[in-house]
Amino acid sequence: MALAGSNRSVDGVRNAEREWHDAHYGAHAAYQYPESLDDFLNIFEKGQISRFCDGGWSWWGYARREVIDAIGDVRGLRVLDYGCGYGNLGLYLSCNGAEVSGFDLSQPAIETARKAARRYGLAAEFLEMDAAALSYPDDFFDLVVGFGVLHHVIKYPGADAHLFRVLRSGGRAVFHETLWDNPLINFARRFTSEHSDAGDAHLTEQAIRRFCRRFPQVQLEKRHLFYMLKRLAKLPRMEWQAELEPRPLWQALSSLDQQILRLRPLRYLCGEVIVYLEK
């Protein structure tokens, strides 16, 4: 079956995506996690996650903090780390009292997540799985959380139905995603984004709402206008920023956005969004 809007087959795109991520995660797995759980929590909580995430700049940790703040207290909740990658978000939520499951298309990523869970004595379960063929029971999770994953899965037929199916009635899903509604930000992404042959989607508000159409409650909280200058940190000639940890700069830009984006029409220009869903 051909992928919508493409002459490539769904299986062909899926295999290309798996191969790209297997190579990516396999190359970085050796230095993914520190030895002790305390060290992992310290690194995660400070946002200095260069040892186990792409790029390694402090702004990445700051964005992850936004997800954690958005989902709130997870104690006693059954949580799905959706497209978990190395599993660091799921492990952090497990440390905070959640019953965590995670899945990813990449086998090397899942192996790294499992090893970390065993090392830290956490009960989080990680499985290699396709978002369009989830094996979890119906109405199983209280919360689904994902960071930068919808642009990977939105193109696969059935992924939206499976997301809706595994979330219980009254359950929530929270995703932090990129937006491609601002032409200037999109131009900068040509130079600062990693590109694969897997046909990653350029998410617009319309595309996100279409993917989430089954949910009775959908809220998009658009974020980051000036803060999108963080993209400059991914230019090769500016890798020195990884050593300087310019976290105060990213926080200042975020504070500026909080003031500027009170003008609601400007929110259309934002480069990222937090997606809130409720079933």
What are these regions (language model features)?
Residues 80, 86-133:
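Class I SAM-dependent methyltransferase SAM/SAH-binding core
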Residues 132-143:
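A short acidic, Gly/Pro-enriched loop at the edge of an enzyme's catalytic core
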Residues 143-155:
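A short SAM/SAH-binding and catalytic strip from SAM-dependent methyltransferases
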Residues 200-216, 220:
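Short alpha-helix
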